[in-house]
Amino acid sequence: MKVAILTDGVYGDRAYNTIKSKFPCDFITVKYYGDFDEITISENTIEKLKDYDLFITYTLNPDLTYELVRKIKELNNKAFVLVGAWKGEGFKKQIESFGNAFCPYLMCDIDEDELKDYKDYLDNYPHLKEFLKYFGKPKVKLYIKNNKIEKIDVLREAPCGSTSETLKEFVGREFNDKTLIDIGLRVQHFCRAGKIRLFVEKEGKKTKAGKILVSGIQVIQIP
């Protein structure tokens, strides 16, 4: 399976560095000109859209994101697109209407349960299912010995790599009631999700990312 990170130059580097540890992965800066309905993607980029099984877009221009998803649907009907940067429920519905794309609220909140209402995605795009074995909603085993964190086993990593970056700091530390709270707070330092939008969101994405990581931790006591 081949993965491509599509960016317009700002985000996506950490996802690339994380995902390439499991799958062949390329980082592609999309060249384009124009705006709104007049977006034109460079021929060089368009040719590359034929070569991958899974795309993750970190393009901040919504018109560019729309055109990328449309082109991928047209040129590569076996490929799936995870849209890592988007705003607005209307835009989400528009993108997902192509049938080959999903706009998660957070990239670290994707698993098969999250996609239960999108069963066709998992059935029709086996590469998405394969990706979710290793990346998406964090799944971690935390081994405790003599009341200290002895070892951490990351079974599924947040695509940005924040799971491992956070937890490696806690190896050897004492484990108590406050430890999980500290983990949930610390991951926010590594999280690249946007800040809370006042009067629109009740909870910021970074705060939610912390809760997601903690909820995915299984604590195992070892002799």
From Swiss-Prot:
InterPro entries: DUF166. It comes from the Archaea. To M.jannaschii MJ0575. This is Uncharacterized protein MJ0838. It comes from Methanocaldococcus jannaschii (strain ATCC 43067 / DSM 2661 / JAL-1 / JCM 10045 / NBRC 100440) (Methanococcus jannaschii).
